């Protein structure tokens, strides 16, 4: 099993976690060697997806109020609340969470079209701004 994150962290079980690109590079080279395929051939098998990220300043006193209101607003979308609020659809996902290091919300979306990813982030940011500005209507 392989897991990764945007900051470059890669975990390969049972090997562990590495925070540089050498492990990922080694895995790609190993796949190229064992499959006999070029990098372009490997990449062509992956779907083209667009990711958009936004950081939204949010006072620590309001972060969890925003997340709770967002979760309630999207209750029909079966939110995953293990780390903030994550919504998943067939074609896209959206994740809103508190930063662990700064007074802000991190909003991330991924979709097969750039416009869809941007729209998801824009809508979540607007929702959060209404709460942080005191205009809580959803």
Where are the predicted features?
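Phosphate-binding and adjacent anionic-ligand microenvironments
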Residues: 1-138
């Amino acid at each position: 099993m392989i897991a990764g994150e945007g900051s470059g962290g890669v975990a390969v079980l049972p090997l562990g976690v590495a925070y540089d690109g050498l492990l990922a590079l080694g895995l790609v080279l190993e796949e190229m060697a064992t499959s006999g395929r070029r990098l372009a051939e490997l990449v062509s098998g992956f779907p083209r997806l667009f990711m958009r990220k936004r950081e939204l300043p949010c006072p620590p006193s309001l972060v969890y109020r925003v997340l709770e209101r967002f979760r309630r607003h999207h209750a029909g979308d079966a939110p995953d609340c293990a780390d903030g609020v994550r919504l998943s659809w067939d074609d896209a996902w959206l994740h809103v969470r508190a930063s662990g290091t700064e007074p802000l919300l991190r909003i991330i979306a991924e979709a097969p079209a750039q416009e869809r990813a941007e729209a998801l982030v824009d809508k979540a940011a607007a929702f959060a701004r209404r709460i942080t500005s005191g205009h809580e209507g959803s």
